[in-house]
A protein has these predicted regions:
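Catalytic metal-binding/acid-base residues of hydrolase active sites
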Residues: 130, 198-199, 247, 295, ...
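Short proline/glycine-enriched turn/loop segments at secondary-structure junctions
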Residues: 231, 261-262, 416-421, 450-456
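N-terminal, active-site-proximal structural segment of metallo-dependent hydrolase catalytic domains
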Residues: 1-210, 220-232, 237, 467-472
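Active-site flanking residues adjacent to catalytic metal/cofactor-binding acidic residues
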Residues: 127, 195-196, 292, 335-337
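Beta-strand-turn-beta hairpins that frame and shape the catalytic cleft
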Residues: 114-124, 236-250, 265-294, 472
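Lumenal/extracellular "mature" regions of secretory-pathway glycan-modifying transferases
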Residues: 204, 217-240, 244, 249-267, ...
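Metal-dependent phosphoesterases centered on the DNase I-like endonuclease/exonuclease/phosphatase
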Residues: 297-436
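Conserved beta strand-loop-helix elements of the APE1-like EEP
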Residues: 212, 234-251, 273-278, 334, ...
């Protein structure tokens, strides 16, 4: 039986900060990264000089600085070789994520007790940030990953402040279907934040330093690296980062075993977490979060379908292993960048996947038909740095108009024909389901499309407000 003194629950024995079981292994891993960094940095800068979006002035600077970078690369190689030989075997001992606990002064929301508070709302957010190593990020016309990470972190805090000292408020229950809104602000009262493409570890740490003290526990540096079955050499993690305003109880990560082209070097997969939300009849009220980022190349729909099937199996397995007798489940939410839309013929396989029979997508009416208020979430990279696309308020106003959507939202894959009216390609999803037999029922209150990160990434941010109420 759980009492008020058990809040927040103690999870030190389950979620330790270091991904290594012994401090010596953690120290060796830090040494390996230090040895690899000079070569990594020089190579990253060289790659960035030849990005298609590089300006002529940068190309001229690259010609002058290229010799210095090559010299640094050569000087760093004798350090990089032992660093790599140390780094590779350590990956077999590494837990596939880092855990940043909140500071001792952290105060979580008051536990939800349905006997006293009939319903509670929870706000979820998903965003693809394109925080790659700086050289690779330039290929998406998004340089300066470290500076962008700082600004993104500050912007995310704007979504936390309205409800730092209490639970997210629910409006009175309203009849009818939920609606969607387009806003220039970050969704208010964030409870759960799932970020994708946070590949650069320095950028990830900048975000963690912002989120952990102000929101709560954070899972970052997620992925299984090094030599993996296939065989694959995974050089980058999954890019996933999960932050929660409620205490984390358990977490796990599975890497997709199938990947092609550039994704073969990336540890994409499914990050699952269990959070405690409150107490009902002396037992825990919990929720499940499943964060993912699927295979990117458009033509690999069959591979994405296999990944969808795998993540459904992994989600079921994680939930079955985590549940305890008597506890109530408020929700199971699957969110992230699925890299397919619900409007293109090229994605017919994914659009008909059983995922949409297991989880509800509030933006979707049926196959190839979205709600009239749903909006595409991928922006055109060619217009990212125009004044309108770099201003949250100006971009919001532009996307309310058909002309603006044609100009600033990415077009169909492979240059296909645009639908009329054109609402863009929605790649970022927040889906949910209720648990069979549960006394707690989740319902969508609102879906939010946000331009708050305009100029900082090539995706819109998506938010979902979910109202969970107890059966009377």
């Amino acid at each position: 039986m759980q009492t008020q003194s058990d809040w927040p629950p103690v999870t030190d024995d389950i979620l330790r900060p270091s991904p290594f079981a012994h401090p010596v292994l953690h120290t060796l891993h830090c040494v390996a990264r230090v040895l690899l960094f000079p070569t990594y940095w020089a190579l990253d800068q060289l790659i960035g000089c030849w990005a298609p979006t590089a300006r002529p002035s940068r190309l001229r600077a690259a010609a002058g600085g290229g010799v210095a970078l090559l010299l640094l690369l050569l000087v760093g190689l004798p350090l990089a070789l032992p660093g790599l030989l140390l780094w590779l075997p350590l990956q077999a001992c590494r837990r596939p994520f880092c855990y940043q606990p909140p500071p001792p002064c952290w105060v979580p929301p008051t536990p939800w007790r349905p006997c006293a508070e009939f319903a509670r709302c929870f706000v979820f957010l998903t965003a693809n940030l394109c925080l790659l190593p700086d050289g690779l990020a330039r290929f998406s016309n998004l340089p300066h990953s470290q500076q962008r990470a700082e600004t993104i972190g500050a912007t995310l805090l704007n979504g936390l402040r309205p409800s730092l000292y209490g639970a997210t408020g629910c409006s009175p229950q309203r009849p009818g279907e939920p609606g969607g809104t387009l806003t220039a602000q970050m969704p208010a009262g964030l409870d759960f934040v799932c970020l994708q493409e946070v590949f650069d570890i320095r950028a990830a740490r900048r975000l963690v330093r912002r989120l952990a003290p102000n929101l709560g526990p954070v899972l970052y540096d997620v992925g299984t690296l090094g030599l993996q079955p296939g065989p694959y050499l995974k050089l980058l993690g999954s890019g996933l980062l999960l932050a929660s305003r409620y205490p984390l109880l358990r977490a796990n990560f599975h890497c997709f075993p199938n990947a092609r082209r550039e994704d073969a070097f990336v540890s994409k997969g499914l990050l699952s977490a269990q959070v405690q939300l409150g107490i009902l009849d002396g037992h825990r009220i919990v929720g499940f979060l499943h964060c993912t980022h699927l295979h990117a190349p458009t033509e690999d729909g069959l591979l994405r379908c296999k990944q969808l099937t795998l993540l459904l199996d992994w989600a079921e397995q994680f939930e079955a292993e985590s549940r305890q007798s008597g506890e109530a489940v408020a929700f199971s939410v699957l969110l992230g960048d699925l890299n397919f839309d619900n409007c293109s013929k090229d994605h017919a396989r994914e659009q008909g996947h059983k995922l949409f029979r297991c989880f509800r997508d509030p933006c979707r009416l049926s196959t190839r038909q979205d709600q009239p208020w749903a909006l595409g979430t991928i922006l055109s990279t060619s217009t990212l740095h125009q004044s309108v696309a770099s201003s949250p308020e100006m971009l919001r106003r532009a996307l309310e108009q058909e002309k603006g959507r044609h100009l600033y939202l990415a077009g169909p894959p492979r240059g296909g024909r645009r639908a009329n009216p054109w609402l863009g390609r929605r790649l970022d999803y927040i889906t949910y389901r209720e648990m069979p037999g549960s006394v707690l029922i989740p319902e969508v209150e609102q879906v939010m499309f946000s331009t708050a990160l305009a100029g900082l990434t090539d995706h819109l941010t998506v938010g979902l407000q979910l109202r969970v109420s107890a059966l009377s």
